[in-house]
Amino acid sequence: MSAESPEPASAEEQKEMEDKVLSPEKAEEAKLKARYPHLGQKPGGSDFLRKRLQKGQKYFDSGDYNMAKAKMKNKQLPTAAPDKTEVTGDHIPTPQDLPQRKPSLVASKLAG
């Protein structure tokens, strides 16, 4: 058991390596911030966004408006009757199960 894994680098060495890796990005970022100081991120977002949010909610269409209006009223929508026990799809119909077609009152032009 003399083959041990190499000892991890100390915290100072790791920090120094990270600084070497990140320093080009940080240097570029510092240059851009010095060149364009007015483009810094504002905590609340852009002025345009803040103004739009102050105006109130806008709706995409009348459906969105009506849904929001219904939520405000907490109006219960009518539900289907619970006594309905009809099951659909319980069997596959065959030609014998189907009712006879009624003859049409209007003669078809194709029948000739």
UniProtKB/Swiss-Prot annotation:
GO biological process, one term: mitotic cell cycle
Signal peptide range: none
In-chain residues carrying the UniProt-annotated modification Phosphoserine: 62, 104
Listed Basic and acidic residues bias regions: 12-32
Location(s) in or outside the cell: Cytoplasm
Gene Ontology CC terms, in alphabetical order: cytoplasm
Family: Belongs to the endosulfine family.
Chief location of this protein within or outside the cell: cytoplasm
Keyword Cell division: yes
Function, as annotated: Protein phosphatase inhibitor that specifically inhibits protein phosphatase 2A (PP2A) during mitosis. Inhibition of PP2A is enhanced when ARPP19 is phosphorylated. When phosphorylated at Ser-62 during mitosis, specifically interacts with PPP2R2D (PR55-delta) and inhibits its activity, leading to inactivation of PP2A, an essential condition to keep cyclin-B1-CDK1 activity high during M phase.
Domain of life according to the entry: Eukaryota
Assembly: Interacts (when phosphorylated at Ser-62) with PPP2R2D.
PANTHER family tied to this protein: CAMP-REGULATED PHOSPHOPROTEIN 19, ENDOSULFINE
Upper classification of the organism: Eukaryota, Metazoa, Chordata, Craniata, Vertebrata
Swiss-Prot/TrEMBL keywords: Cell cycle, Cell division, Cytoplasm, Mitosis, Phosphoprotein, Protein phosphatase inhibitor
Protein's UniProt name: cAMP-regulated phosphoprotein 19
Gene Ontology molecular function terms on file: phosphatase inhibitor activity; protein phosphatase 2A binding; protein phosphatase inhibitor activity; protein phosphatase regulator activity
PTM annotation, UniProt: Phosphorylation at Ser-62 by MASTL/GWL during mitosis is essential for interaction with PPP2R2D (PR55-delta) and subsequent inactivation of PP2A.
Keyword DNA-binding assigned: no
Disordered: annotated segments: 1-49, 72-112
Biased composition (Low complexity): 1-11
